[in-house]
Every structure is written in structure tokens, then in C-alpha cells.
């Protein structure tokens, strides 16, 4: 019909659309919630002491750079920074040779709080609109040299990619599960604990990372799975 023709003329194929960010990101904090990831990365830099003693007591995080958050699929320049080989006398300025991905979930905070006024754990989720996939790209060779003693800087400020799609907390309700820790580990301090969080603080969803190169796409190859995890295993 004529009406259908006008309707179809207004549609654009999803494969031809370049999606943007789902929200205006004013600020973001990156938390280190996977104890397995923290231990693995710690072994690279501190083989004898991979997991620092504060990890199981306080959520570890750092303030990221909101101005370099890009939508998933966006291109960005490979970062440059100082690196130092173990046998080198001085560091060198080079392009990153160990660019790494990080499978993360972005918690979209829609409601703020008054400066200096803490949010109680029991009301914390009232401030969360939903979640989206997030990739905090990391230059591991630059990070290994620059992170001492205050943590990463140029190795993590060049690009982070956020999915254009947000899944609301209401849609995640069927996937909620109890927040659990190993019996031998310490319980969170009272201000980091609540009955509601213990009852359904975890989200039971499977997460995967797949690699699909340009050549794979050209050949119709679906890609290769690099890693998988379940968000209910997050330590915080």
C-alpha cells in the first residue's frame, strides 16, 4: 500500500546505522570488582603479592576520563607513552604494543546526590537507571611503567567504549540472585552491606568477549570467543 511504502522509506537498515552514546556521560568511576581479574593482573606486576590486602575490604576504583568515552565500534588512535624494557637503561616513547580489552558493565546513574551526602546501601539502586556493556581499553606496556605509585594515567585515558543499548534494572529483575562470598572471606563492613544486597545483590547474566577481525567479517566468519564470565561472581 501507499502507506506502507511511505513507512518503509523512513526506515534505515540497522547494518547501515552508526549508533551514538546512549546518554551524556558527565563523570565515571571504574571499579575493580573481579577478584579473579585482580589476581591475574596482580601476578603480572607483583608475582609474590598479587592481591593487595585492602581488596577484600573496600571497593577499589579510580576516576576515569569521561571526555574519551566513545560508542561501541568507534575507531580511536593507538596510544603512545613511555615504556621501559627490563634491560633498558632509560625509557622510550613508543606506540602501545600491548593493547588490551576489559569486559565490564557500566552502571548508568540517573539520580545524583547532594555533595558530601552519602547514599545508604539500602537506597543505592534507586539511583541506578540500568546497565550497559563497557570496555575500558588499556595499554598494558605503558601501564606497567607509569602506574607506580599512584596508578594508571595515560595507559587508560585514551578510549573507553560504551554500548548504545541500556538494559534497565526492571528488565534485569528475573536475573537477580543472592550476593555471596566464600565463607573464609571477610564480610563487608556495615556501610557496604544491606539485607537487600545480600538477598538479591548479584545479577546472574553470562558475559562473553568475541574477536572478529576485518578479514573474518569479509569471509563471513562469526569470530572466536576469547573469554566468558558470569556477573554474579563479581566480588563487589
Walk through the language-model features, giving the residues of each.
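Extended C-terminal subregions enriched in glycine
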Residues: 234-236
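Active-site microenvironments in enzyme catalytic cores
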Residues: 1-228
Amino acid at each position: 500500500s501507499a502507506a506502507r511504502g511511505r513507512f518503509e522509506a523512513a526506515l534505515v537498515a540497522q547494518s547501515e546505522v552508526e549508533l551514538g552514546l546512549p546518554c551524556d556521560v558527565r563523570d565515571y568511576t571504574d571499579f575493580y570488582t573481579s577478584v579473579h581479574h585482580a589476581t591475574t593482573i596482580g601476578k603480572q606486576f607483583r608475582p609474590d603479592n598479587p592481591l593487595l590486602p585492602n581488596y577484600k575490604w573496600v571497593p577499589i576504583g579510580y576516576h576515569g576520563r569521561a571526555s574519551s568515552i566513545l560508542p561501541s565500534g568507534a575507531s580511536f588512535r593507538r596510544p603512545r607513552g613511555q615504556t621501559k624494557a627490563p634491560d633498558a637503561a632509560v625509557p622510550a616513547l613508543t606506540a602501545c604494543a600491548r593493547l588490551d580489552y576489559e569486559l565490564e558493565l557500566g552502571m548508568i546513574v540517573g539520580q545524583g546526590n547532594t555533595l558530601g551526602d552519602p547514599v545508604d546501601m539500602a537506597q543505592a539502586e534507586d539511583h541506578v537507571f540500568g546497565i550497559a556493556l563497557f570496555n575500558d581499553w588499556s595499554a598494558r606496556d605503558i601501564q606497567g611503567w607509569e602506574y607506580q605509585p599512584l596508578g594508571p594515567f595515560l595507559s587508560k585515558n585514551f578510549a573507553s567504549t560504551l554500548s548504545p543499548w541500556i538494559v534497565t534494572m526492571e528488565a534485569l529483575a528475573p536475573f537477580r540472585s543472592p550476593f555471596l562470598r566464600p565463607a573464609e572471606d571477610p564480610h563487608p563492613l556495615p556501610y557496604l552491606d544491606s539485607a537487600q544486597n545480600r538477598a538479591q545483590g548479584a545479577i546472574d547474566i553470562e558475559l562473553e568477549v568475541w574477536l572478529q577481525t576485518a578479514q573474518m567479517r569479509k569471509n563471513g566468519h562469526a569470530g572466536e570467543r576469547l573469554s566468558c564470565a558470569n556477573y554474579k561472581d563479581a566480588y563487589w
